[in-house]
From Swiss-Prot:
It comes from Legionella pneumophila (strain Corby). This is Type III pantothenate kinase. It is found in: Cytoplasm. ATP binds at D6, V7, G8, N9, S10, H11, I12, Y13, T132. GO terms for cellular component: cytoplasm. Coiled coil: none annotated.
């Protein structure tokens, strides 16, 4: 079985795959941890879910937090006796990356693109990842990673208001029933939610025409906040495990 780990800015997400089927999912707050803390956590979460650590044959990591990489890699070696695969510049992806400097593309965005083109071949695709940042990736039917857009995520937007103003509070991120808030909290929640929704609609329209000349596209959504937009007609498919699927596929592509 393969243990796939996605190190994000807010959390570490993980999954255990048996073939192409995901058997286990977990999450851990991604504040910088020691290798021992990470190793103990990984072994514990496996055992708690009736998955023996000894059944893990490969570990694959995708990270956008460099300060966690060394500790996590050390944990894999010390606690699993496995040198993990790291999705990074120079590995096989099956994509033709059109960034001016391909090294700049986040590993999570590459993982999403790998999984998207594998699950939906020969299609023009926009992937929206609703995480700490909300990211857009445009991938052509020929597997060309054309580029995309990045904007603050919902939580980041709300936190920016509470941290940089004297009187605005921290709020829960929800889909509000009314656009017109009748309290400060409701107004922030409305502004954050519908502001991101509006930005997404505009970006989809512009990417559709600029990257794909108006040709048919498929829109995929993933990330922790994606389900909040499930009834807005924003995307065609919600794929919660997209990045983990991409990590697994990348690891298989790079297996000697």
């Amino acid at each position: 079985m393969i243990l796939c780990i996605d190190v994000g800015n807010s959390h570490i997400y993980g999954g255990v795959f048996d073939g192409d089927e995901i058997k286990l999912r977990f999450r851990h707050t991604s504040k910088v941890s020691t290798s021992d803390e990470l190793g103990i956590f990984l072994k514990s979460v496996l055992r708690e879910n009736n998955c023996s650590p000894e059944t893990i044959r490969k570990i694959a990591i995708c990270s956008v937090v460099p300060q966690v990489d060394y500790s996590l890699r050390s944990a894999c070696v010390k606690y699993f006796s496995i040198d993990p695969f790291l999705l990074q510049a120079g590995v096989k992806t099956g994509l033709n990356i059109k960034y001016r400097n391909p090294v700049e593309v986040g590993a999570d965005r590459i993982a999403n693109a790998i999984a998207a083109t594998h699950s939906f071949p020969n299609q023009n695709i926009i992937v929206i990842d609703f995480g700490t940042a909300t990211t857009f990736c445009a991938i052509s039917h020929k597997k060309a990673y054309l580029g995309g857009a990045i904007l603050p995520g919902l939580r980041l937007s709300a936190d920016a208001l509470s941290k940089n103003t004297a009187k605005l509070p921290s709020v829960e991120i929800i889909k509000t029933e009314s656009v017109v808030g009748r309290s400060t909290i409701e107004s922030i929640q409305s502004g954050v939610y519908y502001g991101v929704l509006g930005a997404c609609k505009e970006l989809i329209q512009r990417i559709h025409h600029e990257a794909f000349n108006g040709d048919k596209i498929l829109i995929l959504a993933t990330g922790g906040f994606a389900s909040l937009f499930d009834k807005q007609g924003l995307y065609d498919h919600l794929v919660p495990d997209l990045v983990l699927q991409g990590i697994r596929l990348a690891a298989m592509m790079n297996t000697a």
